[in-house]
Amino acid sequence: MLEKLAVIGLCLGTLLPALAQAAPAEKPKAHGSLGLDSTKKALESGDEARTLAALDEIELSGDGRAAPLVEALLTRGASAKILLRAIGVAGALGKPSSSAAIAPYVKHRAAEVRRTAALSLAHTKGDVAVKALRDALRGSDPALRGTAADGLGALGAKDAVPDLFVVLPKEVPEAAGAIGVLCAGDECKRFVALLGKLPFDVMQSGFLPLLLRTGAEVPDTAKLQLIEQLRRMATQQANALLATALASYPAAGNPKIKAAIDAALHGHTVTSGEL
């Protein structure tokens, strides 16, 4: 018995140092390696290489204390290369205070700067971000309109649904996706009624989120109407959408809607009497 204990002790004595060496060290706090004073000087230096290196360091650290420094840079203005990086870093930090500094850039002359600004506003959030994205929907840049629509959906900007309907006929599929996430009541019925009037490829991104929403904002009658219209289409795309909806239908959803989807996939007519 004593010999066995001695062997176990010897094994543990050999393993513990190795385990201690293999164990990962505790990660330092994100702001530990970021010197705000030196970072501020680099951002104000006017030297492109130093400025870009400082922005890289800020993003790597994830230190929200640096957000005002990036905001100040955006307010001062810079070359397109620096602006792109600064806007992206501000978005990565995700501070609502940064939205005011980013917002003007959705109207920048360079398309890439405009789209990067719209992407970052979806992360910095707030009323300023929502207003800027709604303004971006009215622009002439199709890619910017799509990015703005995505951002409004991500931000839960329900007041923007009327604006999204305006750009939907301009073949902005991202607007359909956002409407499917945000619509309520008659807005959802209006959206479903557009099936067949607008190209399916434009509309389809909004159908799945609409069918899978569990709150009372989306009328079940609108869901049943959509299910029946998709059944009547009898296309591969429509059937695939219904199959995806059935496979991912939430447990908290109305079981009658789930049953209606299943019935439609089997070729059975779906009516409001299903409720």
Language-model features: locations:
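Positively charged n-region of N-terminal signal peptides that target proteins for export
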Residues: M1-K4
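Immediate post-signal-peptide N-terminus of mature secreted/exported proteins
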Residues: L36-D37
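Bacterial N-terminal signal peptides
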Residues: A6-P17
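Structural detector for internal amphipathic alpha-helices that build alpha-solenoid repeat scaffolds
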Residues: A23-H31, K41, A49-D63, A72-L73, ...
